[in-house]
């Protein structure tokens, strides 16, 4: 995304390269990728919004263009970048959401495409999302596809938990998307002195932490929302409320810090932003 005021971009090519490799699609050279995005953003400069929380959303994608039937690797592809101005994700403040722990459907399994940014992952998540909405929940907390036991992602976002002062998030083992926001927040958290555990957390341990009060905060992480606080988890006949259904202090601080870097209000000591001249 980019802001008009600073004309800076937060972009990442490595994830697309890995996604393309898994799908037997050609990779886009990093220099070409970055220059293409910069050229498009420069051309669309008048469409970059300047109000707080707004941005020009940048979406690169690739699809096959070979005119043929059958299941095989295509001979030709098209690489496209589109942009759209978007309003503030939290126009009325950052409000926690109610999450359904999904124990019927699964999002991904090892050896599949769970770590890629491909349409099939989103298609397989729709049934769970519809089920959650019917139960009065906003999103789905996905469990692993083998044991149906370990938490992985929430909706289309990575998720983090603050339990007894430490941070927990699912490891990158082929079923979880290696989110750019996830990676950014891990860097920030460790710089702040937090212990970040990239490890398997069972839903039973999550619910137990909720009941005994050690589950202090929970939040999804992603490009559009940056962070999305969780106020309640519903699992089978049980439920736990997180932080009295209020956004946590750490969640708010992470949001303010990362958006501050993106908007050029805070120093970018990590080199995450790219100026567009």
State the predicted function of each range.
Residues 80, 140-141, 158-161:
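Short beta-strand scaffold segments in enzyme catalytic cores
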Residues 131-144, 150-153:
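Zinc-dependent deaminase catalytic domain
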Residues 4, 17-19, 268:
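Long, hydrophobic/aromatic-enriched structural stretches that serve as scaffold segments
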Residues 6, 136, 178-180:
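A short glycine-leucine-enriched loop at secondary-structure breakpoints
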Residues 12-136, 250:
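Extended Lys/Arg-rich, glycine-bearing segments that form polyanion-binding/interaction patches
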């Amino acid at each position: 995304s980019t802001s008009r005021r600073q004309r800076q971009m937060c972009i990442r090519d490595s994830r697309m390269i890995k996604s393309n490799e898994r799908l037997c699609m050609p990779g886009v050279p990093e220099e070409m990728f970055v220059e293409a995005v910069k050229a498009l953003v420069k051309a669309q400069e008048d469409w970059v919004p300047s109000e707080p929380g707004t941005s020009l959303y940048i979406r690169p994608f690739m699809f096959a263009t070979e005119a043929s039937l059958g299941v095989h690797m295509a001979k030709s592809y098209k690489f496209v970048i589109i942009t759209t101005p978007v309003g503030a994700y939290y126009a009325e403040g950052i409000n926690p959401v109610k999450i359904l722990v999904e124990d019927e459907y699964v999002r991904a399994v090892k050896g599949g495409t769970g770590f890629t940014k491909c349409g099939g992952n989103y298609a397989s998540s729709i049934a769970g999302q519809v089920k959650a909405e019917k139960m009065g929940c906003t999103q789905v907390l996905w469990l692993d596809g083998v044991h149906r036991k370990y938490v992985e992602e929430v909706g289309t976002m990575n998720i983090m938990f603050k339990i007894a002062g430490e941070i927990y998030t699912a490891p990158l083992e082929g079923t979880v998307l290696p989110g750019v926001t996830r990676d950014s927040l891990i860097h920030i958290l460790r710089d702040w002195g937090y212990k970040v555990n990239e490890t398997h957390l069972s839903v039973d341990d999550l619910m137990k932490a909720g009941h005994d009060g050690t589950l202090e905060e929970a939040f999804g992480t992603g490009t559009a929302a940056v962070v999305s606080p969780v106020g309640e988890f519903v699992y089978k006949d049980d439920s736990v409320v997180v932080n009295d259904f209020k956004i946590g202090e750490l969640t708010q601080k992470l949001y303010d810090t990362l958006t501050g870097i993106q908007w050029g209000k805070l120093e970018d000591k990590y080199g995450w932003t790219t100026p567009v001249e």
